[in-house]
A protein has these predicted regions:
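Hydrophobic/aromatic-lined pockets within catalytic cores
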Residues: 76, 80-84, 187-190, 224-230
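Metal-dependent nuclease catalytic regions and adjoining charged, substrate-binding loops involved
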Residues: 195, 214, 227-316
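Short histidine-centered catalytic/ligand-binding loop motif
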Residues: 61, 203-214, 251-252
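Short, charged, amphipathic alpha-helix that recurs within catalytic cores of restriction-modification
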Residues: 211-225
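Short, solvent-exposed loop/turn segments at secondary-structure junctions
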Residues: 160-162, 188-190, 240-243
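Metal-dependent nuclease catalytic cores that hydrolyze phosphodiester bonds in DNA/RNA
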Residues: 1-174, 178
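A structural signal for short, well-ordered beta-strand segments and their strand-loop junctions
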Residues: 154, 177, 181-185, 233-237
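Conserved catalytic cores of phosphodiester-cleaving nucleases, focusing on short active-site segments
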Residues: 72, 172-209, 224-225
């Protein structure tokens, strides 16, 4: 099982064909926004996208929950996907058939087992998540069957959206879609509870009812794909024990009028960051306009990067 590696050159060509970009884009080598960027706090965004280059970003620490989420996403592609979109050098954005296989879970567990946790907490988390991966696959199959996308189901298609008053496009890739519907898939994995009285550790699955931790961020991502495609949204959230499917039919937040309201939040964040990039024009002085919060959970597990960031802001 492999993660998709986008050709930078082909992606840049595609973005360039969408919209004429300002000169300062070349200075920071950042030519688009994305839903995940917009959901990231300004200090973490600045460190990742204005300070680090793309190769350095690819080496940022990951954890077992991220690996587990990748596994479930790719199991979904093999389960219902017919087409996957990829950027191919010299060809641009192209469709490729997803090969059929009966060993969907075997591929996932092989990929899962290749990950080597670096901290004791992540090692314990990885052990728990391994127990839950097969259960999560069961939940995934049931949920995808309930949603019932029609063939041919496509995966990872890149779409763009221009925000009012912003110079850069917002780019994102759709998890699963058919002619009239799309699915945004989110996974929740075991969280560590307080130690028992005897000192042993226990884990529990996080809640996935409406309003769960991360709900607002996920709504923004769904809103982006809805506004970019006009298709009916399905927010599929699962853990190893259950799943929930949120649509405009059962969730007020996913009704078109409420999703459209989120465009203003996207615009505010994107425009603020564009103004920072334009003002500082490639210089590291952008830190003057972004206040860091190193106690935020985003910085947990960042290792040496946290030390670098503290020095970057002059807090050492």
């Amino acid at each position: 099982m492999e993660t998709t590696d986008i050709s930078d050159q082909e992606l840049n060509k595609w973005i360039g064909s969408i919209k004429e970009l300002p000169e300062w884009v070349k200075l920071y080598k950042l030519n688009h926004h994305s839903p995940s960027q917009i959901n990231t706090a300004d200090d973490m965004w600045g460190y990742k996208y204005l300070y680090l280059n793309q190769e350095e970003r690819r080496l940022l620490p990951i954890n077992s929950k991220m690996i587990s989420g990748i596994c479930v996403g790719e199991m979904g592609q093999y389960e219902i996907g017919k087409i996957i979109w990829k950027f191919i050098k010299g060809k641009g954005l192209v469709k490729q058939e997803i090969p059929k296989t009966k060993k969907i879970f075997d591929k996932a567990i092989d990929f899962f087992n290749k990950y080597q946790p670096e901290t004791d907490d992540d090692k314990l988390s990885h052990q728990e998540n391994k127990k839950g991966l097969a259960l999560a696959y069961h939940q995934l199959k049931a949920a995808l069957k309930e949603i019932g996308l029609k063939d041919p189901v496509e995966c990872e298609r890149s779409v763009s959206l221009d925000l009012p008053g912003c110079q850069l496009p917002v780019i994102g890739r759709i998890d699963f879609e058919d002619k009239d519907n799309f699915i945004e898939l989110k996974t929740k994995w075991y969280k560590k509870n307080r130690p028992r009285k005897d000192g042993t550790q226990s884990y529990s699955v996080p809640r996935i009812e409406e309003g769960y931790l991360g709900w607002q961020e996920h709504l923004l991502q769904v809103a982006f794909y809805y506004l970019a495609t006009g298709k009916k949204p399905h927010l599929l959230v699962l853990n190893p024990e259950s799943y929930n499917i949120f649509t405009p039919d059962n969730c007020e937040d996913l009704k078109p009028k409420n999703l459209k309201n989120l465009i203003n939040k996207m615009k505010i964040v994107a425009k603020r960051r564009e103004e920072i990039m334009e003002k500082h024009a490639g210089k590291a002085t952008w830190v003057q306009d972004i206040y860091p919060d190193f106690k935020h959970f985003f910085w947990r597990g960042m290792g040496d990067h946290l030390t670098q960031a503290i020095k970057l802001w002059g807090h050492a």
